[in-house]
A protein has these predicted regions:
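Compact, glycine-rich, soluble single-domain proteins
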Residues: 27-156
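N-terminal signal peptide c-region/cleavage motif recognized by signal peptidases
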Residues: 21-26
Length: 156
């Protein structure tokens, strides 16, 4: 009986360790190979990776040590809703623009690395664009500014 229990325990422990290893694999390295989209705001161009699945959105820009100035990540949700973001496992400071279906920026939040405080949209939005911290203010882009790109045209 004791031997049977030990065998069951070892099997359960092995299964648990395998499950932990498989589920944590996605956070061992940053996401670098996501589909991309070109966005603009006036003369400013953005090369944004698209985080469109729940897994891609959950990982986001975690574990990145740097990001080129013209690049970012746009989070695409199925429906407009109040969106809140944390900086868990995110190593670089970011600015997040919360964007309505038509590409208008609702609000922008500045976010510190590794902080667990929530940064939320002021109203329901479908899109959130993360860029290096201060990128929007340096370009004169603020709440009410409009972004152009195929994602926003598709919503018309």
């Amino acid at each position: 009986m004791k031997q049977k229990f030990m065998r069951y325990f070892q099997y359960s422990l092995s299964s648990l360790l395998l499950l932990v290893a498989l589920t944590s694999h996605g956070q061992d390295a940053p996401q670098l190979n996501l589909e991309r989209v070109k966005l603009t705001s006036g003369m400013h161009r953005i090369d944004a990776q698209i985080a469109g699945t729940p897994e891609q959105r959950q990982t986001g820009l975690m574990l990145r040590k740097e990001m080129p100035q013209h690049e970012g990540m746009i989070f695409v949700f199925d429906q407009p809703a109040k969106q809140c973001f944390l900086m868990k496992n995110t190593l670089i400071p970011l600015s997040a623009a919360f964007i309505s279906d038509d590409g208008v920026i609702v609000n922008i939040e500045e976010m510190k690395p590794l902080a667990l405080d929530a940064h939320c949209s002021a109203q329901p939005v479908r899109y959130v664009l993360e860029m290096n911290k201060g990128w929007f203010s340096k370009k004169g882009i603020k709440a009410g500014s409009k972004l152009q790109g195929p994602l926003f045209q598709a919503q018309k």
